[in-house]
Amino acid sequence: MTWQNDYSRDYEVKNHMECQNRSDKYIWSPHDAYFYKGLSELIVDIDRLIYLSLEKIRKDFVFINLNTDSLTEFINRDNEWLSAVKGKQVVLIAARKSEALANYWYYNSNIRGVVYAGLSRDIRKELAYVINGRFLRKDIKKDKITDREMEIIRMTAQGMLPKSIARIENCSVKTVYTHRRNAEAKLYSKLYKLVQ
């Protein structure tokens, strides 16, 4: 009898999440169907590990997929998307190449936490940990992008050349290349590949 109750509850919860989240777009990007479906199912799956109701999560949270396909958009418009989610509990889901950027935004804005989506991690526990408000600065194990590196990343994403960046930042071209190299090491990729 209890397995039927559990099944019924799970079905009801899953149905609730799928119906309700379409209009509110609490998972970004809603156009990434696999991420959207996978994260919706994960949240339902960890229902017993989280303290908040699914309705509250749907209403108050925004889950953002920071993958290589969406990084350029987030880099170019970080002030816009940060303003758009103001007042919400923002959870960044970071792929390996975006971990340092996720850490930057965590330190420099009002982000609730970061879920690192590496293959060896238990994403269910990490997601519950962040939703429950337990993610703290001490939980960040990886490097974060510095303010200067972020400025150079933004300008590179806009198509600016190192010489122009150096003139704007009032530094040498060599310094621009040093900051780019440092950012690339933290992002595990060349900047031009990430921001195309």
Curated annotation (Swiss-Prot):
Keyword DNA-binding carried by entry: yes
Main location: cytoplasm
PROSITE patterns xref list: HTH_LUXR_2
Effect of G159A: Decrease in activity
Ranges annotated as DNA-binding: 162-181
BP-aspect Gene Ontology terms: positive regulation of DNA-templated transcription initiation
Induction: Negatively regulated by H-NS. Positively autoregulated. Also positively regulated by IHF.
Molecular-function GO terms, alphabetical: DNA binding
Database matches in CDD domains: LuxR_C_like
Source organism superkingdom: Bacteria
Subcellular location: Cytoplasm
Residue span(s) of domain HTH luxR-type: 138-196
Pfam families xrefs: GerE
Protein name: HTH-type transcriptional regulator EcpR
Native organism taxonomy: Bacteria, Pseudomonadati, Pseudomonadota, Gammaproteobacteria, Enterobacterales
